[in-house]
């Protein structure tokens, strides 16, 4: 696991965009896209590079981490619609090459296995972007999730539904269930890139990177992965015991060694 500490959120977003751009330019790339606030700056930077420098996404494809159950794909709060408005519609990535779990599947219990099979058929994900919750969750893998879990249906906590109600007309409109890639599915991506900002994420980052491997902190499963880059700002790094070493290692990173 490589931990990259940047001074500001904008520097974090730029570094993450550099990583994604490398895969896109080497192409064809299969991207794992996350929603939420953490990757937004990186999406904006990638869109700028497409607009101003011709960064070409036409050969790329993408898989989403999760999707609401029972919400039409066309609904403005489906994660498919959200990722379109935040990123896909701003680059030349064909929406037919962007896949999400089918929250309206007539056989919702089997949809997770179908989605995992689709990822495998595409050759797997090259680079997966991830945020992290204050409790260490990634995707909708809340504390207690099996570290080898596959894409499956999860029940949203009442607090999560209340938190998400601001995006809907009322809390009654927020779905109770979501399809999410499991920790095992996420871990099959060849490169995991975690993004975090602010003191509010500092304890979660410390637990994920330096704490024990435990279902209590789902993101700690990254410790077992062969290629992880955690890109954070100084505030999110404030609880790391080895922060000085991570800064030293980055400063002396060999010129031939990429992220």
From Swiss-Prot:
The keyword Acyltransferase does not apply. It is an enzyme of class 3 (hydrolase). InterPro entries: Glc/Gal-6P_isomerase (IPR006148), Glucosamine6P_isomerase (IPR004547), Glucosamine6P_isomerase_CS (IPR018321), NagB/RpiA_transferase-like (IPR037171). The keyword Cell cycle does not apply. It comes from the Bacteria. CDD domains: GlcN6P_deaminase (cd01399). Pathway: Amino-sugar metabolism; N-acetylneuraminate degradation; D-fructose 6-phosphate from N-acetylneuraminate: step 5/5. The active site is at residues 66, 135, 137, 142. GO terms for molecular function: glucosamine-6-phosphate deaminase activity; identical protein binding. Its EC number is 3.5.99.6. Keywords: Carbohydrate metabolism, Hydrolase. It catalyses: alpha-D-glucosamine 6-phosphate + H2O = beta-D-fructose 6-phosphate + NH4(+). GO terms for cellular component: cytoplasm. GO terms for biological process: carbohydrate metabolic process; glucosamine catabolic process; N-acetylglucosamine catabolic process; N-acetylneuraminate catabolic process. Belongs to the glucosamine/galactosamine-6-phosphate isomerase family. NagB subfamily. HAMAP family: GlcN6P_deamin. Catalyzes the reversible isomerization-deamination of glucosamine 6-phosphate (GlcN6P) to form fructose 6-phosphate (Fru6P) and ammonium ion. This is Glucosamine-6-phosphate deaminase. It comes from Rhodococcus jostii (strain RHA1). The gene is nagB.
């Amino acid at each position: 696991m490589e931990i990259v500490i940047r001074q500001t959120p904008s520097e974090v977003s730029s570094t993450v965009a550099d990583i994604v751009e490398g895969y896109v330019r080497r192409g064809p790339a299969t991207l794992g896209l996350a929603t939420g606030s953490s990757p937004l700056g990186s999406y904006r930077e990638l869109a700028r590079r497409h607009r101003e420098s011709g960064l070409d996404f036409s050969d790329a494809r993408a898989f989403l981490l999760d999707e609401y159950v029972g919400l039409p794909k066309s609904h403005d709060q489906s994660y498919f619609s959200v990722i379109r408005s935040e990123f896909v519609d701003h680059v030349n990535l064909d929406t037919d090459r962007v896949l999400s779990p089918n929250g309206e599947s007539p056989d919702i219990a089997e949809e997770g296995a179908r989605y995992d099979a689709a990822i495998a058929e595409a050759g797997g994900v090259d680079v997966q972007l991830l945020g992290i919750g204050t409790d260490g969750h990634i995707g909708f893998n809340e504390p207690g999730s099996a570290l080898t879990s596959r894409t499956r249906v999860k029940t949203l906590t009442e607090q999560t539904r209340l938190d998400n109600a601001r995006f809907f007309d009322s809390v009654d409109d927020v779905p109770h269930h979501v399809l999410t890639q499991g920790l095992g599915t996420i871990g099959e991506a060849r490169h995991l890139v975690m993004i975090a900002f602010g003191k509010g994420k500092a304890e979660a980052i410390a637990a994920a990177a330096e704490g024990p491997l435990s279902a209590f902190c789902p993101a700690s499963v990254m410790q077992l992965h062969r290629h992880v880059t955690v890109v954070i700002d100084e505030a999110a790094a404030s609880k790391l015991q080895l922060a000085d070493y991570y800064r030293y290692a980055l400063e002396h990173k060999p010129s031939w060694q990429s992220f």
